[in-house]
């Protein structure tokens, strides 16, 4: 039976199963009913559209006027050569967003992706076939390889070409070959009404599936950040997360859990100290200044607090002091009510 709640459960489980260098299964759970597809579908779209990759954007072949031309000594016509070329998956070796690369082949030869590897670019699908030339052929071409996202048709690329001898190419930048998701039922705290999202990501080898998934997440965060300018949701979420983390520590437990001597406990109780976190928030001088707290009790409290990982006056709470203070005040108000 589902309990009445005032907010959706935040998933806590996440796994990545690397099936190969180019395939991974990414799972997260438990989601409330309906939340799985709400998040999985846009992530899938972003995997295709926002993941950065490389592609040839233009080519000039010596002796060739246009893509429907033919070339002496090459088995393929130029159109088929370009189709094969677009199947090659390039990586630029430098930090540059663009490389102009020259290639030259002579004599009888079958040309594969591995034959285009040089100091500027790498072809990740090395065994992909490109062309066959005979002993009379001299195949010389210049290729522009660029970094980008998504897909840009040749008509748009043509507008940016300054050299008319280059043939514009359809540019398939995305390194994600396939992204699919499944929404599975999952049992959580004896409740079967939760969902598990399983994303299967396949890349072409330019990047790993994990890198592609990270890129998609970053793109989603950036797109949603425009709404945060007014709502300040990220700050609220951070504070809520920190509050949840505090609840999982000893800081919000009663000082009775410290097993103090009766003298030390009675002194703290009379001073109004209820929670362990109050001791962590105090400085040593503040603690020593409590009425009737002797040196023996002071040393006892200091030693016990050090043993649980939160020494008196600890700096570990630097960013969370106000959150802890507010949480303790809230708990005290509830107890008084």
Curated annotation (Swiss-Prot):
CDD domains for this protein: RNAP_alpha_NTD
GO molecular-function terms, A-Z: DNA binding; DNA-directed RNA polymerase activity; protein dimerization activity
Gene3D superfamilies per UniProt: 5' to 3' exonuclease, C-terminal subdomain, DNA-directed RNA polymerase, insert domain, RNA polymerase, RBP11-like subunit
Keywords: DNA-directed RNA polymerase, Nucleotidyltransferase, Transcription, Transferase
Sequence segments annotated as region (Alpha N-terminal domain (alpha-NTD)): 1-231
EC number, as in UniProt: 2.7.7.6
One cellular component (GO) term of this entry: DNA-directed RNA polymerase complex
Coiled-coil segments: none
Pfam families named in the record: RNA_pol_A_bac, RNA_pol_A_CTD, RNA_pol_L
Catalytic activities: RNA(n) + a ribonucleoside 5'-triphosphate = RNA(n+1) + diphosphate
One Gene Ontology term from the biological process aspect of the record: DNA-templated transcription
Root EC class: transferase
HAMAP family found in the cross-reference section: RNApol_bact_RpoA (MF_00059)
Purpose of the protein: DNA-dependent RNA polymerase catalyzes the transcription of DNA into RNA using the four ribonucleoside triphosphates as substrates.
Family, similarity comment: Belongs to the RNA polymerase alpha chain family.
Free-text comment about domains: The N-terminal domain is essential for RNAP assembly and basal transcription, whereas the C-terminal domain is involved in interaction with transcriptional regulators and with upstream promoter elements.
Subunit: Homodimer. The RNAP catalytic core consists of 2 alpha, 1 beta, 1 beta' and 1 omega subunit. When a sigma factor is associated with the core the holoenzyme is formed, which can initiate transcription.
Annotated protein name in UniProt: DNA-directed RNA polymerase subunit alpha
UniProt source species: Campylobacter jejuni subsp. doylei (strain ATCC BAA-1458 / RM4099 / 269.97)
